[in-house]
Amino acid sequence: MDEIRYPIGKFQAPAAFCEEDAKQWISDIRQIPAKLWEAVSGLNEEQLNTPYRDGGWTVAQVVHHIADASMNAFLRTKWTLTEDVPSIKPFEENDWAKTTEARSLHIEPSLQLLEGLHERWAHLLESMSSDDFQRNFYHEGTKENVPLYVLIAMHAWHGKHHTAQIVSLRQRKGWN
């Protein structure tokens, strides 16, 4: 089950900031929309409404979730760059995945949103200094200060993680 749920493994937070790692995270963030488009290309409505695992979200819900999470992460980035240790509220991703548009809207609006958002986010990240990446926000859910570089690393992993779930489902089902 872990291979299905975590096809690229669980997220491992970096212990320290490294500029070379940051370049890779930014590249990953920029590429997520194209890789996600490729992963869902040619899927019909029935396939889009198939859970990627037993008890998991449907492919469409995963796509909408990536958009939700990316919007949150982009805003967290902006707040962290413009405020002194802003307090960030967590979002209840399972509840968000049950909202009407996450359950019934076609995936194209979320894919289009991701294209523009990730291009904008990557552009912002490329302009940041080493000190910017080490700025912190306070996460109300974990009650911890989180460095921005950890958020960026996590979201680079996050997009690849969910895209791999969809690719894995396609392989298991023979949806080539």
UniProtKB/Swiss-Prot annotation:
Gene Ontology CC entries for this record: cytoplasm
Cellular localization per UniProt: Cytoplasm
Lineage: superkingdom: Bacteria
Enzyme class: hydrolase
Keywords annotated in UniProt: Cytoplasm, Hydrolase, Metal-binding, Zinc
UniProt GO MF annotations: hydrolase activity; zinc ion binding
Cofactor info, note text: Binds 1 zinc ion per subunit.
Cofactor(s) required for function per UniProt: Zn(2+)
Pfam families: DinB_2
Subunit and interaction comment: Homodimer.
Function recorded in the entry: Possible metal-dependent hydrolase.
Protein name: Putative metal-dependent hydrolase GWCH70_0602
Protein source organism: Geobacillus sp. (strain WCH70)
